[in-house]
């Protein structure tokens, strides 16, 4: 997989999960290894040593001198921002010396290419977006499994892609389909990755400190597409639709959109409402005698279809709550259909999927008030999606480390849906200033527990108390899961006080 390079020397930068996976993979293939981390003793160093991987370890600041001694490939961990001055200087030096700089995704793409020479030709599906990646990735994996395929789910979702591939090789159980969740960090170093189909779910402000600008962040997301990839795009998101080919372009026929309105183009997906029922639908050519003819006509572009809305299933048959999750379901269905999986088992699987923890998860209903854990909502876009998706009166709990985001997109959904907003954490004042114009009652609380109890007092039957912070958690908690645990404990206390059970 390393071309003409024989036992190349690889410099791995960063010893997180991906860095360790790169080191394992390279050691497996006989590479000489130098591993560098800004920490003198990163946690995974012990694992590296315990596994007997022969590598030179260098702790401390990155410098171009790390390239000396014959380095041929740099393996870059996704957590390291290429804008950080020391790393930027090292990458510039690598480029000057024509040293390849790969992330784990590029190693994975090269590995699949090498395996392809032995006849292994799996389908590869990839998902990115600011929000909804994990839900859509797991759902897509389930859909493929229920269609009878052997499936591997990996990437940002964990396990690392290279670790999962190594395990599949060792077990002689290579999957038919790879379903990959990919972050902008992982895509930043993509070079030859070309999945069969890939979806961008949405693009809103996030990780701007890492990428430097929104445009750079969006551009990284766009690297998910190869030259022949079927593009699955959210037509409700203008930033996503910038990746749609121009009408009449050669690859326009390989573009599928999904959204929360009725689809107008053949092969697209959306929602159709009839007598108060929302249906997941596909736009089909009414005149096409079969699906093969329909696809051929779309590819040729010579036929103007008479569009009809083919009902797939009622949206409320999904077990995952919210309109944003209906959109995620449409994206997963579109990806699976893009590799020609039959519709019937996919629709059964859509009804089966129960969702992910801490992602608009209803954890209790007390006195007809839903308590919803969306602690994974660590950016503004996620909270907007949760508010609009639940589409009911809400007492919102928000705040934490805002990561320099603009909170203005919260104004409209808060004004529409919120009975009140409870604010916590470092950036509560910034959120308060932004939401003041809504006229919605705002209250500051020193702890999440206090915010939950106050929200419970304000909520009325039929409402939801929603923890969707729009912020990272590290100013008050170990991580978003710890924040969710504190929320759940407070809800349990409320249930006990009211004589209910959760």
From Swiss-Prot:
Query: What is this protein identified as?
Result: UDP-N-acetylmuramoylalanine--D-glutamate ligase
Q: In which pathway does it act?
A: Cell wall biogenesis; peptidoglycan biosynthesis
**What reaction(s) does this enzyme catalyze?**
UDP-N-acetyl-alpha-D-muramoyl-L-alanine + D-glutamate + ATP = UDP-N-acetyl-alpha-D-muramoyl-L-alanyl-D-glutamate + ADP + phosphate + H(+)
Provide the taxonomic classification. Bacteria, Pseudomonadati, Pseudomonadota, Betaproteobacteria, Burkholderiales
Q: Which domain of life is it from?
A: Bacteria
State where ATP binds. Answer: 129-135
Q: Note whether Nucleotide-binding occurs among the keywords.
A: yes
EC number(s) reported in the record? 6.3.2.9
Which NCBIfam families does the record match to this protein? murD (TIGR01087)
The primary gene name is murD
**Mind listing the GO molecular function terms for this protein?**
ATP binding; UDP-N-acetylmuramoylalanine-D-glutamate ligase activity
A Pfam family matched in the record: Mur_ligase_C
Reply yes or no: does the keyword Cell division apply.
yes
Q: What does this protein do?
A: Cell wall formation. Catalyzes the addition of glutamate to the nucleotide precursor UDP-N-acetylmuramoyl-L-alanine (UMA).
The compartments listed are:
Cytoplasm
Gene3D superfamilies given for it? Mur ligase, C-terminal domain (3.90.190.20), Mur-like, catalytic domain (3.40.1190.10), NAD(P)-binding Rossmann-like Domain (3.40.50.720)
Query: Per the record, which residues fall in region Disordered?
Result: 288-307
One GO cellular-component annotation of the UniProt record comes to: cytoplasm
């Amino acid at each position: 997989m390393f071309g003409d390079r024989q036992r190349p020397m690889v410099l791995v930068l960063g010893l997180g999960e991906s860095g360790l996976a790169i080191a394992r993979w390279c050691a497996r293939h006989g590479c000489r290894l130098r591993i560098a981390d800004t920490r003198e003793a990163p946690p995974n160093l012990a694992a590296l040593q315990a596994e007997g991987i022969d590598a030179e370890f260098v702790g401390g600041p990155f410098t171009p001198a790390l390239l000396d001694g014959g380095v041929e490939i740099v393996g870059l961990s996704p957590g390291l921002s290429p804008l950080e001055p020391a790393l930027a200087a090292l990458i510039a030096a690598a480029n000057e010396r024509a040293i390849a700089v790969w992330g784990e995704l590029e190693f994975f793409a090269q590995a699949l290419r090498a395996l392809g020479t032995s006849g292994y030709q799996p389908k590869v599906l990839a998902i990115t977006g600011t929000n909804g990646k994990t839900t859509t990735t797991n759902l897509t994996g389930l859909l493929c499994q229920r269609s009878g395929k052997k499936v591997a789910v990996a990437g940002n979702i964990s396990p690392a892609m290279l670790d999962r591939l190594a395990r599949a090789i060792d077990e002689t159980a290579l999957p038919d389909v790879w379903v990959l969740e990919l972050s902008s960090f992982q895509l930043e170093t993509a070079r030859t990755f070309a999945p069969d189909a890939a979806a961008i779910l949405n693009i809103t402000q996030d990780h701007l400190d890492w990428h430097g600008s929104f445009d750079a962040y969006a551009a990284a997301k766009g690297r998910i597409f190869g030259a022949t990839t079927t593009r699955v795009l959210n037509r409700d998101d203008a930033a996503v639709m910038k990746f749609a080919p121009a009408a009449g372009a050669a690859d326009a026929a390989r573009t599928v959109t999904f959204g929360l309105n009725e689809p107008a183009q053949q092969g697209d997906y959306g929602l159709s409402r009839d007598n108060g029922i929302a249906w997941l639908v596909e736009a089909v050519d009414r005149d096409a005698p079969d699906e093969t003819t329909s696809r051929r006509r779309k590819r040729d572009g010579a036929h103007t279809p008479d569009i009809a809305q083919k009902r797939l299933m009622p949206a409320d048959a999904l077990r995952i709550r919210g309109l944003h999750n209906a959109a995620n379901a449409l994206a997963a269905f579109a990806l699976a259909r893009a590799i020609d999986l039959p519709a019937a088992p996919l629709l059964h699987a859509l009804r089966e999927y129960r969702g992910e923890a801490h992602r608009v998860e209803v954890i209790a209903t007390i006195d007809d008030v839903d308590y919803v854990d969306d602690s994974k909502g660590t950016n503004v876009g996620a909270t907007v999606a949760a508010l609009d998706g639940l589409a009911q009166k809400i007492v919102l709990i928000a705040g934490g480390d805002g990561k320099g985001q603009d909170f203005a997109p919260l104004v409209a959904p808060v004004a529409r849906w919120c009975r009140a907003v409870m604010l916590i954490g470092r950036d509560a004042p910034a959120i308060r200033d932004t939401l003041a114009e809504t006229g919605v009652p705002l209250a500051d609380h020193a702890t999440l527990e206090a915010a939950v109890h106050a929200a419970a007092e304000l909520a009325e039957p039929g409402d939801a108390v929603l923890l969707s912070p729009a912020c990272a958690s590290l100013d008050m908690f170990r991580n978003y899961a710890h924040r969710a645990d504190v929320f759940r404990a407070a809800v349990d206390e409320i249930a006990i006080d009211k004589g209910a059970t959760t």
